[in-house]
Amino acid sequence: MRKIIHVDMDCFYAAIEMRDNPTLIGKPIAVGGEAKHRGVLATCNYEARKFGLHSAMSTAQAFKLCPNLILLPVNMPLYKQVSQQIHQIFRRYTDVIEPLSLDEAYLDVTDSTACSGSATWIATEIRQAIFNELGLTASAGIAPLKFLAKIASEQNKPNGQFVIKPEQIEHFIANLPLKKIPGVGKVTAQRLMAMGLNTCADIQHMNKARLLEQFGKLGQRIWAFSHGVDERHVEPHRILKSVGVERTLQHNIDELAQAYVILAELYALLIQRLKTHCPTLSFSMLHKVGVKLKFADFHVTTLEKRGMLITLNSFELLLTQIWQRAAGREIRLIGLHVNLPETTESKTQVQMSLW
């Protein structure tokens, strides 16, 4: 079986800020946009989390919960630089690395000879090297399957690791709450609970067709993971599957005419981003577009359509249709995205550079 490590840095952006400014240690801090600009938190440290703060929370709400919060601006160039340094440490042990974001990655160490081939010791050494050389802590999960490695990395956070050995998989999965499965969000978890499904063992004893009927593609993933099946490999080059832009508005809007103006600006940015990330890709190959709205109550809705050209008119048509879902609610964010083709040629042309 494979030996997979999932490394997840602990409150990465905030940890870098505390490392570089020790006077922040022990105080509630967050990294994100200002409240007056309707910003949201990118991350926060554990002191701030004690007040109920979390990533993606509006900055205004964060200050209501924690009036003494220290808010710092996002310093992306610095975070990318540190991420590259972490990546260099990974390379000492394996070249099979799949970055998920600046602070998170899968490593396949199946063929590594480091630490006598022990994935557990490799994870320990990586975490120690990150701390010794960069002054940051990381958590890690070690398992034969990708989704289990990711779940394991959350078991002993912060600054810890957890191992799921091959002979432990069956027992671990049987007792695993379904809400822990990657891709199962709050709403899906509630739907599963309403059906009397709480753990993977419950899925193992139910009819597969019923699950697929209720949850479609996600149901297939839930079924597979609940039976200990995850055939995904660690991919050294993650493929860029979509390109998108979005904007949190300075003020909520409730009129479609206002949204059209913002849509036109976002469309120009989307075309620019497509040309940057996919310089050799013909727009005629793109036929699936989407529009996203976030309401004032933070609920999100998305509408995607196939067979549409990448034109402003296409996005205006989708916006008109999705606007009906607002049902009188104000809009705080508008987003556009384009799904990229899944041909071999396009995959070689378009790759993520997260490190």
From Swiss-Prot:
Keywords assigned by UniProt, alphabetized: Cytoplasm, DNA damage, DNA repair, DNA replication, DNA-binding, DNA-directed DNA polymerase, Magnesium, Metal-binding, Mutator protein, Nucleotidyltransferase, Transferase
Cofactors, names only: Mg(2+)
SUPFAM superfamilies: DNA/RNA polymerases, Lesion bypass DNA polymerase (Y-family), little finger domain
Pfam families given in the database record: IMS (PF00817), IMS_C (PF11799), IMS_HHH_1 (PF21999)
Site (Substrate discrimination): 13
Location in or out of the cell: Cytoplasm
EC number: 2.7.7.7
Catalytic residues, chain numbering: 104
Major localization class: cytoplasm
Binding site for Mg(2+): 8, 103
PANTHER family: DNA POLYMERASE KAPPA (PTHR11076:SF33), DNA REPAIR POLYMERASE UMUC / TRANSFERASE FAMILY MEMBER (PTHR11076)
Family, similarity comment: Belongs to the DNA polymerase type-Y family.
Descriptive protein name: DNA polymerase IV
Organism name: Pasteurella multocida (strain Pm70)
